[in-house]
């Protein structure tokens, strides 16, 4: 039946028999759907997926992690093992032998402390010459981040500051390290590590060499009261 005839039959312009016969014929038997993949135990798309969508070979080098932010790594890098600067009692006994072994054994602890203090004082003399740039150096031992203002004021006045953060928690110590690094950058100074959780803030007009920083760490100047 043509489209025009169908149109006329729909609006009653021609007999409906021909129109109905075509649409009321018995439909052809439908084909039985393919057996589901789960019945055969095989995924019909498995082979095609493997063929068309094969996983590419990735190179580990292309996905190597980048360098972390400097501010996040600063504090972690400062957590290197701390080397003790104490004078061993053996060296003290060999340099200053006692007349009696019994007496030396009974006063061993006191002699070790006194001798260590003498050695520290003797080293501080040539390191911080009177009138030198490090003669007015000061050591601050903050217990929380609230004491950052004191550090900033001392440094702003041109005083070299040693920050001893050993008694602070790691979280507060990291915040104070970030603050001090920004302060040194803003005032064109320098910010250096002396020992584990111990740092030196130097004003712009004071140049502290690597040798001087090493000697500060060896003498344990920051640990003196």
Curated annotation (Swiss-Prot):
One of its GO terms (biological process) is division septum assembly. It holds the Pfam family SepF. Its main location: cytoplasm. Residues 28-54, 77-86, 115-127 have a biased composition (Basic and acidic residues). Keywords: Cell cycle, Cell division, Cytoplasm, Septation. One of its GO terms (cellular component) is cytoplasm. Residues 21-134 are annotated as: Disordered. It is found in: Cytoplasm. The keyword 4Fe-4S does not apply. Belongs to the SepF family. Cell division protein that is part of the divisome complex and is recruited early to the Z-ring. Probably stimulates Z-ring formation, perhaps through the cross-linking of FtsZ protofilaments. Its function overlaps with FtsA. Homodimer. Interacts with FtsZ. This is Cell division protein SepF. The gene is sepF.
């Amino acid at each position: 039946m043509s489209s025009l005839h169908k149109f006329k039959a729909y609006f009653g312009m021609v007999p409906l028999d021909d129109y109905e016969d075509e649409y009321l014929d018995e439909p052809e038997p439908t084909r039985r759907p393919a057996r589901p993949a789960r019945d055969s135990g095989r995924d019909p798309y498995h082979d095609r997926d493997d063929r068309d969508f094969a996983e590419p070979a990735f190179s580990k080098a292309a996905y190597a992690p980048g360098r972390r932010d400097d501010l996040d790594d600063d504090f972690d890098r400062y957590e290197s093992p701390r080397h003790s600067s104490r004078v061993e009692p053996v060296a003290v006994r060999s340099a200053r032998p006692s007349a009696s072994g019994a007496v030396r054994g009974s006063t061993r602890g006191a002699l070790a402390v006194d001798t260590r203090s003498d050695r520290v004082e003797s080293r501080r003399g040539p390191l911080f010459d009177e009138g030198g740039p490090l003669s007015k150096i000061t050591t601050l031992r903050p217990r929380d981040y609230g004491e950052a203002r004191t550090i900033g004021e001392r440094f702003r006045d041109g005083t070299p500051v040693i920050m001893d953060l050993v008694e602070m928690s790691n979280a507060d110590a990291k915040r104070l390290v970030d603050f001090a690094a920004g302060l040194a950058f803003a005032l064109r100074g320098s910010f250096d590590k002396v020992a584990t959780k111990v740092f030196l803030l130097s004003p712009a007009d004071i140049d502290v060499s690597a040798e001087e920083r090493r000697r500060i760490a060896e003498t344990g100047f920051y640990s003196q009261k």
